[in-house]
Amino acid sequence: MSQQHTLPVTLSPALSQELLKTVPPPVNTQQEQMKQPTPLPPPCQKMPVELPVEVPSKQEEKHMTAVKGLPEQECEQQQQEPQEQELQQQHWEQHEEYQKAENPEQQLKQEKAQRDPQLNKQLEEEKKLLDQQLDQELVKRDEQLGMKKEQLLELPEQQEGHLKHLEQREGQLELPEQQEGQLKHLEQQKGQLELPEQQEGQLELPEQQEGQLKHLEQQEGQLKHLEHQEGQLEVPEEQVGQLKYLEQQEGQLKHLDQQEKQPELPEQQVGQLKHLEQQEGQPKHLEQQKGQLEHLEEQEGQLKHLEQQEGQLEHLEHQEGQLGLPEQQVQQLKQLEKEEGQPKHLEEEEGQLKHLVQQEGQLEHLVQQEGQLEHLVQQEGQLEQQEGQVEHLEQQVEHLEQLGQLKHLEEQEGQLKHLEQQQGQLGVPEQVGQPKNLEQEEKQLELPEQQEGQLKHLEKQEAQLELPEQQVGQPKHLEQQEKQLEPPEQQDGQLKHLEQQEGQLKDLEQQKGQLEQPVFAPAPGQVQDIQSALPTKGEVLLPLEHQQQKQEVQWPPKHK
C-alpha cells in the first residue's frame, strides 16, 4: 500500500527556501486532505483520517485496544497505516509547497496585467499634458518673436528721430563768434592776471581785478550751462550698440530677400559672392581698427593736454608764490582750465559723427554693388539660354549633314524614273541579262516611307535654321556681354564655334543650289549608259563626271 500512494517529488533545498520566503502563509491544509481521503482496508475504515504528524503513545494504545479481536497481521497493518499516513502528509505538504511556489508567478502575472492598463492610462495623460505644455510654449514663443520683430521695426524710426534731434543739438553747440570772442577775452584777462615782478610785494588787489573776478564767475556759470547741455547730448553706449546691431540685422534681411529672389547661381558666381562677403567683412574689421586707433589718438591727446595743464599749473603756482594770491583765485583758475578742455571734447564728438556718416556712405556703396551683381546674374542667365539655343542648332546641323545623302539618293531615283520613261517611249530593246540587275538596283533605291518622313522633318528644320535679321544682330551683343563676363580664352573658342556654324550654313546653301539645278534628258543612245552607272552593293557613289566616263567604258554590246 505504501508503494502505491507515494510519489517521488524532488526539490532542491535552495528553491524550497526561496519559495517559502516569498509565498504567503498556507491555507488550512487539513481541509484539502479531507477532500482527498486515502483508501484504507475494510477492517480499519473506522479509523479517523486526520492524524497529526507525531502520533502519541496513548493513541497507539487505544488503537491496540480497539482492534483486539483481529488477527496479528491485521494489527500489524494497522500499525503500519499511521506511518503511511505520515508519508502521505509529507508528500501532500511537499506538493502544496510546490503549487504555492508556482502560484507567485501567476500572481505576479495577474498583478502585471492589472497594472499595465493603469500605467498606460497614466502615460497617455502625461503625454497629453506635455503636448499641451509644448503647444502653449510654442504659441508664447511665436507671440514673443512677433513682438520682437515689431519692436525691431519700430526702433529704426525712433532712432532716426533721435539722430535728427542730436544733429539739431550739434548745430546749437557750434559756438558762435561771440563765444569765441569771449574765450579770447578770457585769455587776455589771464595774461593781465600775470602780474609783473614789480607788483610782487603788493598783496591788496585793486578794484579793477575785483571786477574782472566777477566777470570770470559769470563766464564760469555760462560754461557750466554748456557742459550740462553737452551731457544731455552725449549718446549712451547702449544706444550706439543697438544702432549697430539694427544695421547688421537690416543688412542680413536685405541679403536674405535677394537670395530668395535670385535663382540658383553658378559656381563662379557663388565664389564671387563669397569673395564679396569677405570684402564686406573686411571694412567692418578696418572700421573697428580705425575706431581703436582714434581712441588711442584721443588718449594721447588727453595725455598731452594733461601735461600742458600740469605745466600751466606749475607756472601758476610759481606766480602765486610770487604774488601771494588767495586760494579762491587759484580755484577759479583751475575751473577755467577745465572749461577750456571742454571744446576739445565737443570736437571729438563731432569727429565721431562724421565717421558714422562716412560709414553710412560705405553701406550705400555696398548696396549699389549688390544691385550690379544682380544685373550680372541676369545677363549670365540670358547667355546660358542663348548657348543652349546654339547647341540645339548645332545638333540640327549635324542631323542634316547625316541625312543629306538621302536627298541625293532621291534625286538619283527621280533621274532613273525619268530615264525609264524615256526608254519606254524610245522602245529600246532590253538585254537578256539586265532585267534582274535592274530589279535589284530598283529595290535598293526604293526608299521606305520612314525616310520620306525624315526628309519632311529635315525640310522643317532647314526652315527653322534660316536665321532672321534679329538673330543675326544678336551675336554681336552676345560677344560684347561675353567679353565683360568671361575670360578671353573662352571668348575666342565661342567665336570660332560661331564662325564654324556660319560656314556650315553656307555649305548647306551651296548644296541646295546644286540640287536645284535642272536635270537634262539624255539622248536615246545614252539611256542604258546611265543604268549601268548605278552603284551596286558595296560600291561608293562617285561624282557625275567619273560616272559618265565609266558609262562610256562599261557599255555592253547590243545583241542583234
UniProtKB/Swiss-Prot annotation:
GO terms for cellular component: cornified envelope; cytoplasm. One of its GO terms (biological process) is keratinization. The keyword Translocase does not apply. Residues 1-15 have a biased composition (Polar residues). Residues 92-115, 159-172, 212-231, 252-264, 274-320, 335-353, 404-420, 454-463, 476-486, 494-510 have a biased composition (Basic and acidic residues). Keratinocytes of epidermis and other stratified squamous epithelia. Residues 1-131, 150-359, 404-534 are annotated as: Disordered. Residues 76-91, 189-211, 321-334 have a biased composition (Low complexity). Substrate of transglutaminase. Specific glutamines or lysines are cross-linked to keratins, desmoplakin and to inter involucrin molecules. It is found in: Cytoplasm. The keyword Amino-acid biosynthesis does not apply. InterPro entries: Involucrin_CS, Involucrin_N, Involucrin_rpt, LRR_dom_sf. Keywords: Cytoplasm, Keratinization, Repeat. Directly or indirectly cross-linked to cornifelin (CNFN). Part of the insoluble cornified cell envelope (CE) of stratified squamous epithelia. Belongs to the involucrin family. This is Involucrin.
